[in-house]
Amino acid sequence: MMDLQGQFLIAMPQLEDYFQNTVVYICEHNEQGSMGLVINQPTDLSIAELYSKMNFMMKNDRTFSNELVLAGGPVHSERGFILHKKAAKEFEHSYKITDEMFLTTSADIVETFGSEDAPEKYLVALGCASWTAGQLEQEIADNAWLVAPASDTILFETIYEDRYPAANQLLGINPHNFVFSQVGHS
């Protein structure tokens, strides 16, 4: 079985609809299937707005970046997923992806946003992408996705519209050079 957990999936140009030009960070990959977050489709909702909509008592000492909440995928689109670096504090519903990367789905992490208890680096997504057992491997075999090692720089520092070309660059690919015909297939 491929080890895809903690890797990027990069959509091939022929992939259309929801996943066109997307980069997905794979949070979980096992015999039951796979789950990941699209990291380059921002919504128009900022993390600060999300925080206030969740009715937390806004504290004056909180400072928020103007980062946007991501559209993480078409599944559970009303549910929040926070991808973050290891934090000093443990959160109620956290899943270890790698030694340094975690996925948290409990509201206790949101309560830390803008404070010193927050993870140093994090992104917030509504919804996720999921695949049944063997489905993702088949899509990769069918050339729907490229697999690349994940990059913290792309995850947390690269602006949204540059994440797709930056992920392709990890593999030495310029997405503008893709040939759209399937060479060798008749």
Question: Where are the model-predicted features located?
Answer:
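A short aromatic-anchored loop/beta-hairpin motif
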Residues: M1-V124, A129-S186
